[in-house]
C-alpha cells in the first residue's frame, strides 16, 4: 500500500530502491560496514523499523560487496521480522558462490520465517546463464497468488529454450559449477591481494564475484 516502508541494506543491488518506489512504497536503506563484513546487524535494522515497516529485502551474499550475514545476525534479524510481522524478500541468487567453506543458510529455514519469506533465486550466477533470464520464487501460496496477478500480465512465461537449459544445468551442471566457484575463489584471492598491495583497502568478500575496495583515501577533496 502507498506509504508502506520497504527496508533494505546498503550497498545493494541497484533495483531495490526504484522497484520499491514503482510499487508506491517508501524505501528505507540501512547501511552496512566493512568492519562487520557487510553483514546487516540486527541493532541497525531495529533502529529503522516503524509501525509502517512492511517488507525487508535481504541479499546474501551481497551484490556489490560480497558480504555474508553471520548465523547470529540472521537469527537476530529473524526475531525482529517475527516481532514486527515483516515480509522478507530474500534474494539468494549468489548462494552457491561462497568461499572459505562457509555454508549457506537461508533465513527461510529459521523459526517463524518460512511463512513470511519470499525466496528469490535463479540460474544466472551459479550456472553462468545470465543471458537466459530465468529465475524463480518460492513463497507461501497466498503470496504467490498475489504475485501472479502482476506476473501473468507482465512477464508471461520463461522461454522454453531457457527452461531446457536450466534442466540440463540442474541435472548435469554441479561439477561445472564447482569448477567455476573454485576459479572465482582463486581470482578473489589474487585481486584482493593485489589491490591491497597497491594501497587500496580491499575487503575480502565471502561470496558472489565482486570486490568492493575503499578508495576514499585516494580521492581528492572534490572527488
Model-derived regions, located:
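PLP-dependent class I/II
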Residues: 1-223
